[in-house]
Amino acid sequence: MCVPSTPQPPVIGRFAPSPTGPLHVGSLVAAVASYAMARRQGGLWLVRMEDLDTPRVVPGMADDILRTLECLGFDWDGDIMRQSRRADAYGAALQRLLAAGHAYPCGCSRAEIARAATAPHDGDGEIPYPNLCRRGLPPGKEPRSFRVRVPAEPVEFTDLVMGPQHHDLPAMCGDFVIKRADGLFAYQLAVVVDDEAQGVTQVVRGADLLSSTPRQIVLQRLLGFDTPVYAHVPLVTGPGGGKLSKRDNALSLAAGRDLTREGGMLLLAALRFLGQSPPAELAGASGARVLRWAAGNFEPSAIPTAAAPFHASP
């Protein structure tokens, strides 16, 4: 008797830029990797605008980013999700966490946390929360933000690029904020709710977000959500060798370039940065043609792990 095989669910990837500045080559690398890794498996590729941090959003930048993607030859599936319109969904998730005892109000200021912290931290500006409000707000304290209770056990997962991961959240960050003192929902909660709502199964993004992944996995588990597969691609370094910033205008995609004409060249450079070997005959090809090649030939195992500069020409 022949037993029919169970159909595999479709791969759903996404690219989620923040409209706080124009796309730069670091954004391009993440977009190419997420696009190729979804399309190579016949999957969907979604675009989401992470415009949650409204004070930092540049007016008109979301549309500028979409135009840039179109000029480069990207095509996406479905409507654009915008985080700025999803406060109700984030609020519902927060209420679920509070009702289950997984989250709590916090009345601490940053200065109070810094004074109370006794554990050493890694110097990146983040101090593990010293649990001042974990058992309830002290007398006279008003809630400023909301935090999630992180588990004592480490969070482990395997990243498709960076390999096995082991993160001790209590030592790394402690109970982290999921709704900020300014009333905005935190990125960690919003992205988890959005990935679940869109059915995202594969998250491909820059290595600067690797430390966010264990936090998001904790939230997924507490909310009963599925955990996507993660792949964190190496960062593009700026002129000084550090992480590329949106302030590095020389590496902006739109800086003095005709993207319709030069898009293919930039995409080929992004593919080479990602360890791929596009054929010589693609030199001078359109962006759409280069992306078609990437969709059929991208090899995730070739992606390097180390940050490196971006070279637009071979």
From Swiss-Prot:
Keywords: Aminoacyl-tRNA synthetase, ATP-binding, Ligase, Metal-binding, Nucleotide-binding, Zinc. GO terms for cellular component: cytosol. It comes from the Bacteria. The keyword Ligase applies. L-glutamate binds at R14, F15, A16, P17, S18, E50, Y187, R205. InterPro entries: Glu-Q_tRNA(Asp)_Synthase (IPR022380), Glu/Gln-tRNA-synth (IPR000924), Glu/Gln-tRNA-synth_Ib_cat-dom (IPR020058), GluQ/Sye (IPR049940), Rossmann-like_a/b/a_fold (IPR014729). Binds 1 zinc ion per subunit. Pfam families: tRNA-synt_1c (PF00749). A motif ('KMSKS' region) lies at residues 243-247. A motif ('HIGH' region) lies at residues 17-27. GO terms for molecular function: ATP binding; glutamate-tRNA ligase activity; zinc ion binding. NCBIfam families: PRK05710.1-3 (NF004314), PRK05710.1-4 (NF004315), queuosine_YadB (TIGR03838). Belongs to the class-I aminoacyl-tRNA synthetase family. GluQ subfamily. This is Glutamyl-Q tRNA(Asp) synthetase. It comes from Geobacter sulfurreducens (strain ATCC 51573 / DSM 12127 / PCA). The gene is gluQ.
